[in-house]
Amino acid sequence: MGDHDVALCHVSRYNHANYWAFVPLPTVSDDTGCDSLHHDSASERIRMAPPASASKAGAAEERLHPYERRLLDQYQIHLQPANRNPLSRADSAAGREETAQTPAQVQMVPVVAVADSTSDQHASVASSQDLVDLFFLEGSQAVDGLCFSPYPIYGWRTAEERRAAVCEVFKTYNVVTRLPASPAALAAAQRRYSRHRHSAIAPINKSAIETREQYWRRLSNLYTQKGVKDAASAADAAATTATNGAVPAAPAYEPEDPFYIIDLGRVVEQMARWRHELPMVRPYFAVKSNPQPAVLEVLSALGAGFDCASKEEIHMVLGRQLVASPDDIIFANPCKQLGDLREAQACGVTYVTVDNPLEMEKISRLMPSAHAIIRIKTNDSKAQCSFSTKFGAPLEDVEGLLEAARQFNVTVCGVSFHVGSGNDDQSAYVSAVRDAYQVFQQAVQYGFKCTILDIGGGFPGTEVVEGSGNTSFEAIARTIRPVLAELFGGGDVTIISEPGRYFTAASHALLMNVFASRTLRLSDVEVSRQAFQSVVSMDEPEEYQYYVNDGLYHSFNCILFDHAHPTLLLLNDGDGADGVESGTEAAAVCSEEEGETSLSGPLANDPLFMSAWDRRRSFARRPLRITTIFGPTCDSMDCILKKQPFPEMKLGDWLLVPDMGSYTTAAAGFFNGFATRRLEWVSSVDLCARPRPVYTREGNTLRCVSE
């Protein structure tokens, strides 16, 4: 199927747990020249209030491309002007201008009525691609620079410049946006098209939509095969070089080396989702979570600021020219080393977080131009990673901090908090915002006018599994929007945040190879316990130990430092999840089946569907064994799975680990000389807002014939 290249974003868009509605079906045409079929998705809409500038918005909508107009109509989005006047503040440093901007163009909460705090929110966007298309449409020339909310777009770039900047990053890192479609997906699309071509009612099975796991599995198979081919090509080139008498260069990597597949499109999608859910809050990406240059460059292009914890991170951001000015950086380490303070002063960084009087004294001596943001303690008892034991001033200590700031002549300009990472208690966010408001009032009594609210980070970046009890980002956003509007909706407060894992967690998938194994006899006690649990096959009462080429000293440091629980998936484990079959056979098997429902109106995006053959492979899964998995180093503590049920593996098997994009590579070392160096760049979304592609039938397959 290599000749059937279909845009990846139109083939592998996955169904997010929080976006159940189906995405639009791509336009399909006969090679005989029949009329194309257009379908729009159907879902409940949420009406917005009329735009403030109806005449200008109406004129802009009249000039919109039909596809763009359909997007706005589909999600009930109205164009409106935004408050683009940046907040001015007095700067106490000698020799500088009287007034300066707050973190470059960070949007302010305008004066709006807060009777209905959700009235300015749009309907949930069903498609990842639609989210991205809407993000780049907002503020563009196509809509006369108008916004979809009362808040200006992030950063200093225009909409067109943002898109061009992201495209340039993709070009620099050779990001692959086109991959072959799976035979099952194209066969399923062909069958539904031919069968229901003239009908508005078609059977749709939600369970057939390609999930994020299936997406990663499909890419994993492609790139493991690519590694073998690249290694063979390198060997041929080395042989040719040796024949000519030159010393052959060492290969970039071996075919069995571990590697990352990095989906930069997911980062773009997450920014689009953030803008949709929290348009009043500008994100300052936590560099510590993933300092990969490509990730930083994409986020810079999208208008993010940066949360830096050290002078090295400040140098990284400024050296790569990722910000318009140092005011796009917040030095968010409450306890800073003296050298870092000196360097921040030299670099022109202004905004720093503080949580104790000694820090106020240090800042007054070493960073006199700083504007302090008081970090307060929050209730993070239900967080996966809590920080209040180390950072944050209790509310009863805030007055002492304000007194110290006045004593040492340090300007206090705002309040920050962090409720911890993975905090499922939504009330913690509300309480923290209200506590911050209380500090705003206290600051006035000491002669300080606070104009910045930093709501921290820790927002979830992965899909919420139904029944897990975890809280989605959308649910958190719905919780904090009303309280932000109620307490900080007066127009004189800049609201920022410090998300890290939110942007990158789901953007990386790790592939690692099994390079050794052995078995150990289980003790009688362990045999009895495992037999009682009836979990694993006890025909061979042994512990199976495997060795893989990434471990605790490298990507899996997140187990120790981030309290993470990575998911290990065995590729080609015999359950059909990775199976590939002929298009004809798949189409034949994908017939009437249980669970199909008839939906009137729009069809789902056919290339998203996996065939019934994919889900009904008769191969039995490999037997479950008591399994321990070690990393590659000589340390016996390098263990990522210990005596747990796992499918039996063999030498050369690949393990897929999704959601490995935050606090993994950032803290990875080179212990014993091991490292994961190979990176493969892809994008699951397209950057071009345009109609869906047109497909034509050729026998039993579909071919993309237009962009």
UniProtKB/Swiss-Prot annotation:
<feature type="site" description="Stacks against the aromatic ring of pyridoxal phosphate and stabilizes reaction intermediates">
    <location>
        <position position="418"/>
    </location>
</feature>
<feature type="modified residue" description="N6-(pyridoxal phosphate)lysine">
    <location>
        <position position="288"/>
    </location>
</feature>
<keyword id="KW-0210">Decarboxylase</keyword>
<feature type="binding site">
    <location>
        <position position="663"/>
    </location>
    <ligand>
        <name>pyridoxal 5'-phosphate</name>
    </ligand>
</feature>
<dbReference type="InterPro" id="IPR029066">
    <property type="entry name" value="PLP-binding_barrel"/>
</dbReference>
<comment type="pathway">
    <text>Amine and polyamine biosynthesis; putrescine biosynthesis via L-ornithine pathway; putrescine from L-ornithine: step 1/1.</text>
</comment>
<dbReference type="GO" id="GO:0033387">
    <property type="term" value="P:putrescine biosynthetic process from arginine, via ornithine"/>
</dbReference>
<keyword id="KW-0456">Lyase</keyword>
<feature type="region of interest" description="Disordered">
    <location>
        <begin position="83"/>
        <end position="102"/>
    </location>
</feature>
<dbReference type="GO" id="GO:0005737">
    <property type="term" value="C:cytoplasm"/>
</dbReference>
<keyword id="KW-0620">Polyamine biosynthesis</keyword>
<dbReference type="InterPro" id="IPR022657">
    <property type="entry name" value="De-COase2_CS"/>
</dbReference>
<dbReference type="InterPro" id="IPR000183">
    <property type="entry name" value="Orn/DAP/Arg_de-COase"/>
</dbReference>
<dbReference type="InterPro" id="IPR022643">
    <property type="entry name" value="De-COase2_C"/>
</dbReference>
<dbReference type="Pfam" id="PF00278">
    <property type="entry name" value="Orn_DAP_Arg_deC"/>
</dbReference>
<feature type="binding site">
    <location>
        <position position="458"/>
    </location>
    <ligand>
        <name>pyridoxal 5'-phosphate</name>
    </ligand>
</feature>
<dbReference type="InterPro" id="IPR009006">
    <property type="entry name" value="Ala_racemase/Decarboxylase_C"/>
</dbReference>
<dbReference type="InterPro" id="IPR002433">
    <property type="entry name" value="Orn_de-COase"/>
</dbReference>
<feature type="binding site">
    <location>
        <position position="635"/>
    </location>
    <ligand>
        <name>substrate</name>
    </ligand>
</feature>
<dbReference type="InterPro" id="IPR022644">
    <property type="entry name" value="De-COase2_N"/>
</dbReference>
<dbReference type="GO" id="GO:0004586">
    <property type="term" value="F:ornithine decarboxylase activity"/>
</dbReference>
<feature type="active site" description="Proton donor; shared with dimeric partner">
    <location>
        <position position="634"/>
    </location>
</feature>
<dbReference type="InterPro" id="IPR022653">
    <property type="entry name" value="De-COase2_pyr-phos_BS"/>
</dbReference>
<keyword id="KW-0663">Pyridoxal phosphate</keyword>
<feature type="binding site" description="in other chain">
    <location>
        <begin position="561"/>
        <end position="562"/>
    </location>
    <ligand>
        <name>substrate</name>
    </ligand>
</feature>
<protein>
    <recommendedName>
        <fullName>Ornithine decarboxylase</fullName>
        <ecNumber>4.1.1.17</ecNumber>
    </recommendedName>
</protein>
<comment type="subunit">
    <text>Homodimer. Only the dimer is catalytically active, as the active sites are constructed of residues from both monomers.</text>
</comment>
<comment type="function">
    <text>Catalyzes the first and rate-limiting step of polyamine biosynthesis that converts ornithine into putrescine, which is the precursor for the polyamines, spermidine and spermine. Polyamines are essential for cell proliferation and are implicated in cellular processes, ranging from DNA replication to apoptosis.</text>
</comment>
<comment type="similarity">
    <text>Belongs to the Orn/Lys/Arg decarboxylase class-II family.</text>
</comment>
<dbReference type="Pfam" id="PF02784">
    <property type="entry name" value="Orn_Arg_deC_N"/>
</dbReference>
<feature type="binding site">
    <location>
        <position position="421"/>
    </location>
    <ligand>
        <name>pyridoxal 5'-phosphate</name>
    </ligand>
</feature>
<feature type="binding site">
    <location>
        <begin position="498"/>
        <end position="501"/>
    </location>
    <ligand>
        <name>pyridoxal 5'-phosphate</name>
    </ligand>
</feature>
